[in-house]
């Protein structure tokens, strides 16, 4: 699956407008979710658009959703040699990432790209690769909102990005909690000005 924004292995946008959370259980994805564009924002009346954000193994964007017992495995067929070749081909002379780099997109997660007011319960990401540019997480690219929780579960994927890269979540936002979650995947920041990299967040 290749998308420019709001792209997921099961659904692109899980937006629940009600105040009560909707529960989804046992979702699975074993396909590759690829980012087709880096971040680009514009506002031109009715033609406003945002590209290059919100990519996830299950969902690109979630709001007021409880996701439990779900599993995602992305890029599991990619070999280490293929990854190294792709990454090396995506550097400019000064070490900056180019548009040819596989490290594209903001808010990229093994399960969800970005979640607001959501819970992830006992979800896992299997051995594979989660690749993005900024705000890249093994389970979630970014979290925001009250009572947001990740409980249980694990990440086994290799997580690579440029800035704000975490084994579980890239940035743990306002009033959010992460507990009982393990990460066994490699986490690394690559390219010029790489920064803010953590095993969990």
Where are these regions (language model features)?
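Surface-exposed loop/turn motifs in large extracellular/passenger domains
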Residues: 1-201
